[in-house]
Swiss-Prot record:
Pfam families: PPR (PF01535), PPR_2 (PF13041). InterPro entries: Pentatricopeptide_rpt (IPR002885), PPR/CCM1_RNA-binding (IPR051222), TPR-like_helical_dom_sf (IPR011990). It comes from Arabidopsis thaliana. NCBIfam families: PPR (TIGR00756). Keywords: Repeat. This is Putative pentatricopeptide repeat-containing protein At1g31840. PPR repeats lie at residues 98-128, 145-179, 180-214, 216-250, 251-284, 285-319, 320-354, 355-389, 390-424, 425-459, 460-494, 495-529, 530-564, 565-599, 600-634, 635-669, 670-704, 705-739, 740-774, 775-809. PANTHER family: PENTATRICOPEPTIDE REPEAT DOMAIN CONTAINING PROTEIN-RELATED, TETRATRICOPEPTIDE REPEAT (TPR)-LIKE SUPERFAMILY PROTEIN-RELATED. It comes from the Eukaryota.
Length: 840
């Protein structure tokens, strides 16, 4: 590569020999160039000399004194078809001090596709002349070329010569040359990167006329977007204010585009820009406000959204359909149905023509909240407005009616769809089929399924899932399993919902082994269980007494990346509570709090019970007080748990204090509350107090239950007044309260303690006749009664009967049998002495 110097005469003599025979003194027609013939002759001569490579420096007294700068550029242009010759001539002219135009040689090279060479020549110019050289040169020698201008701008930007790049752009636009958008954007980026936003503001009007709108992003929008992306918010806002104060025209459309981008994740910056627009222009329109209203609604900041809505109205801008629908939808999604409906009514009152989408979404909100009455009102208003429902509207109403159990009304809506020539969607069918299945009408559900197939609608996994769930809830598990296999035959992939339905169905039938088989199938089919799956399987393990397995499943959820919900925690906590392992239950509750899972009042009630089981009275009291002072209101179960807990630990004064608090609640004491207190009074032999409490129950309208009567009967049975127990037993039956096996056991126990074993046996038979299954307590009472009076054979027979019915003896019964030591041959399994018939 050559590095040029205009003072290097030695180089000139080496590279350019005399060529007097080639060139003659030329007569120019005028100052702008050669005649056509002379130009061609000069170009041909130079081309020949350069190709032969045998010329020295042109004679300075002849050529140098007559060939001016503009003439040099004309020679370059005449060599356009021979770019290599033109390049060598350009270099000679540069060395000769002719100051050839770089624009001209760039024009020649680019026209011939020699972009890399042009880049190198520009680099040479920078090396020799520095960044201050005249890039355009004698540009007036030829009309501007957009490609060359683009090239020069990009070269200048590459070297940080952003002011020269802008100069080229401005000059070209003044002459009507349109620079490609991408080049203008790159120049703007370079100006912004060089912190020369002031130059953009100075020439903003030229940039706006530079052809980058309306097909592209405006200069204003581009600059703001770039500055905001760099985090230079203040500079962006200052730029906007500057161009507005200088009187440049900025369209509100440009501002709206910037606001839309900012409202996604920079809502506060968008708010500042809007404030500036309101302060210095341009005049906002309804889209401007709707953009930010939508941004606030998506963030749930409804107060700010509504404030902006009011500002829009105050500035005389009438909200349109988009404004109202955006704000209404925001209120509904935030659960503020009242405000949403108020705005909905306001829009109708002001004559805003709400469309079917707004009406349908409004109906959908009320359907989802269970307020079908209001949904119907909105539907009627829609019809009054002359707006025809579409399939989506009808489907939403069908779903709501099905959820409300009004399946035949829903089917009527389905008829409306067909009558109006509309095509039901797959969601329409799934909603109706689900409605039929949930009301137990599987036949109609499957009939609709068949109709759907006949009409050419292929059922999806949702439809199949609904039908499988319907079969499972009806206990038709073999049909449910076969239908699931049919899904696989249709190449429909089973999902977790289908498996959950099957597992739940087997659990309802107490077929836990089958439920676990389905659970294992999920792994075979590559279906990942969800929290609901694990919770159901945990219940299976708990019901079979396998708490460790349930705990393993619980922690397996964490290993699989699942977050157990409140129901999963509650299921396990309650299980450990019932199995007298309160410490583990409390540890699980602590884990629940650490994982920030919100506990409902049911979980809190279990925790209170656990605390009392662990004798942590102060903690239970503190927990209860926190509930009262916090957002979660204790329910009747909470109060009853507290009263029962204090009573179990003989803290009757505290129990009475909670009882007094309960009296002033909106719900007050119930039957369970009074039964707890009656039980405590009976245990403390305060029969007068227990009878008085029983009377209060009748006065307050609380109906005693079998447990209430059982407490009183137990006290009478253990005292000398066994007849009192009989009277209460008869009274309970007269009032239509069915005695439980516990009630019968109390009477049997009282009779056995008095040696009235035959009467006790009759009562035992009455319990069986009443379809009650005697538990180990009932059997143990009567067996011990037989043993006490020496009727060991009958005791053995009853024991054998107990085993045949699947009731396992407890430790208390085993000790009683050991004490009376009946003959082993009587107690051996399989021996049956038929001296007295026993009930089957």
């Amino acid at each position: 590569m050559l590095l040029f110097s205009s003072s290097s005469l030695q180089l000139r003599e080496i590279f350019f020999p005399r060529i007097f025979s080639v060139f003659v003194k030329l007569n120019f027609l005028n100052s702008r160039g050669f005649s056509s013939d002379s130009a061609k002759a000069l170009a041909a001569g130079i081309s020949k000399a350069i190709k032969e490579g045998n010329f020295n420096l042109l004679d300075s007294s002849v050529y140098g004194s007559n060939l001016q700068r503009n003439e040099t550029n004309l020679v370059l242009l005449s060599l356009e078809s021979e770019p290599n010759s033109a390049l060598k001539y350009f270099r000679w002219a540069e060395i000769s001090g002719k100051d050839p135009s770089f624009y001209t040689i760039a024009h020649v090279l680019i026209r011939n596709g020699m972009f890399d060479v042009a880049d190198k020549v520009f680099d040479e110019m920078i090396t020799n002349r520095g960044k201050d050289f005249n890039v355009l040169g004698s540009i007036r020698d030829r009309s501007l070329d957009a490609d060359v201008c683009k090239f020069l701008m990009e070269c200048c930007c590459r070297y940080g010569m952003v002011d020269k790049a802008l100069e080229i752009f401005v000059y070209s636009t003044q002459l009507g040359v349109v620079i490609p958008q991408d080049s203008v954007y790159r120049m703007l980026n370079s100006l912004i990167g060089s912190d020369r936003v002031d130059l953009i503001a100075d020439h903003f009007d030229k940039l706006c006329r530079g052809g980058i709108e309306p097909s592209g992003v405006s200069a204003h929008g581009f600059v703001l977007d770039a500055l905001f992306c760099k985090g230079e918010v203040t500079k962006a806002l200052d730029f906007h204010r500057l161009v507005m104060e200088r009187g440049f025209r900025v369209g509100i459309v440009s501002c709206n585009k910037v606001l839309k981008g900012l409202s996604v994740d920079q809502i506060e910056v968008a708010s500042r820009l809007l404030s500036l627009v309101l302060d210095c222009g341009p005049a906002p329109n309804v889209v401007t406000f709707c953009t930010l209203i939508n941004g606030f609604c998506k963030r749930g900041e409804m107060d700010r959204a509504f404030d902006l809505f009011k500002v829009m109205e105050q500035r005389g801008i009438e909200p349109d359909l988009i404004a109202y629908s955006t704000l209404i939808d925001g209120y509904f999604k935030a659960g503020m149905l009242g405000m949403g409906h108020k705005l909905f009514s306001q829009a109708l009152h002001k004559g805003v023509k709400l469309d079917v989408v707004v009406f349908s979404s409004t109906i959908d909100v009320y359907v989802k909240s269970g307020d079908l009455a209001t949904a119907s009102v909105v539907y009627k208003r829609m019809l009054c407005q002359g707006i025809s429902p579409n399939v989506v509207t009808y489907t939403i109403l069908i779903k709501g009616l099905c959820q409300d159990g009004r399946i035949y009304e829903a089917f009527g809506m389905y008829g409306q769809i067909l009558k109006r020539g509309m095509e039901p969607s797959i969601v329409t069918y799934s909603s109706l089929i689900d409605g039929f299945c949930k009301c137990g009408n599987l036949r109609s559900g499957f009939a609709l399924y068949e109709d759907m197939i006949k009409m050419g609608y292929p059922p999806d996994v949702v439809i199949y899932g609904v039908l499988v769930d319907g079969l499972s809830k009806q206990g038709l598990m073999l049909h449910a399993m076969r239908f699931s296999v049919k899904m696989l035959g249709q190449s429909i992939r089973l999902n977790v919902v289908v498996f959950n339905s099957l597992i739940d169905g087997w659990c309802r039938l107490n077929r836990f082994d089958e439920a676990l088989k389905v659970f294992r199938l999920m792994g075979i089919y590559g279906i990942k269980p969800d929290v609901a799956t694990f919770t159901t399987v945990m219940r299976v393990s708990i019901m079979e007494g396998r708490l460790e397995e349930a705990l393993f499943l619980f922690f397996r959820m964490f290993k699989m990346g699942l977050e157990p919900d409140a129901l999963a925690y509650c299921t396990l906590i309650d299980a450990f509570c019932k199995h007298m392992k309160p410490t583990i239950g409390l540890q699980l509750f602590d884990l629940m709090q650490r994982n920030k899972i919100s506990a409902d009042i049911a979980v809190c009630n279990v925790v209170i019970h656990l605390l009392f089981k662990c004798h942590r009275i102060e903690d239970a009291s503190k927990f209860f007080n926190n509930l009262i002072e916090g957002k979660m209101e204790p329910d009747i179960v909470t109060y009853n748990t507290m009263i029962c807990g204090y009573c179990s630990l003989r803290r009757l004064d505290e129990a009475e204090r909670i009882f007094e608090l309960l009296k002033v609640t909106p719900f007050g004491p119930n039957t369970v509350t009074l039964t707890i207190l009656i039980h405590v009074l009976c245990k403390n032999n305060d029969m007068d107090g227990a009878i008085r409490m029983f009377s209060i129950m009748a006065e307050k309208g609380s109906k005693p239950n079998a447990v209430t009567y059982g407490c009183l009967m137990d006290w009478f049975s253990k005292s000398v007044d066994i007849e009192g127990s009989f009277k209460l037993f008869e009274e309970m039956q007269e009032k239509g309260i069915s005695p439980s096996i516990v009630s019968y056991s109390i009477i049997i126990d009282g009779l056995c303690k008095r040696g009235r074993v035959d009467e006790a046996t009759n009562i035992f038979h009455q319990a069986i006749d009443a379809k009650l299954l005697p538990d180990v307590v009932a059997y143990a009472i009567l067996i011990r009664g037989y043993c006490k009076v020496g009727r060991l054979v009958e005791a053995a027979l009853l024991y054998e009967h107990m085993l045949r019915n699947g009731v396992k003896p407890d430790d208390l019964l085993q000790r009683a049998l050991s004490e009376y030591n009946p003959p082993k041959w009587l107690m051996s399994k399989g021996v049956w002495v038929h001296d007295k018939p026993m009930p089957d």
